[in-house]
Regions:
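Basic, Lys/Arg-enriched alpha-helical interface segments
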Residues: 1-69, 80-93
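Catalytic-pocket segment enriched in acidic/His residues
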Residues: 77
Length: 93
């Protein structure tokens, strides 16, 4: 379950509100991926579908995971006690 968001724009997408700061063409896919995160019982649930490309991050994002929206955009989040924290849509490039 999603417990917190990393920024207001991601929370807007979750709430079904269009964001002017994020590309319109990713918003529906991002909302669907946010629902997947919210409905996950554990982190391994996000390995399916394989198109999510679930990854554990390193470097300055150690402790975070990400799934892909598309080639450019990702949803990053922390996973603790079967909950997603600091969920945020980011431009990965």
């Amino acid at each position: 379950m999603i417990k917190s968001f990393g920024n207001k724009e991601t929370e807007k997408i979750w709430d079904g509100i269009q964001s002017k700061k994020l590309p319109a063409d990713i918003q529906n896919v991002a909302r669907r991926k946010l629902r997947m995160i919210n409905n996950s019982q554990n982190i391994n649930d996000l390995r399916i579908p394989p198109a999510n490309h679930l990854e554990k991050l390193s470097g300055n994002l150690i402790g975070y995971y990400n799934i892909r929206i598309n080639k450019q955009w990702r949803i990053i989040f922390k996973w603790e006690n079967d909950n997603a924290l600091d969920v945020e849509i980011v431009d990965y490039h």
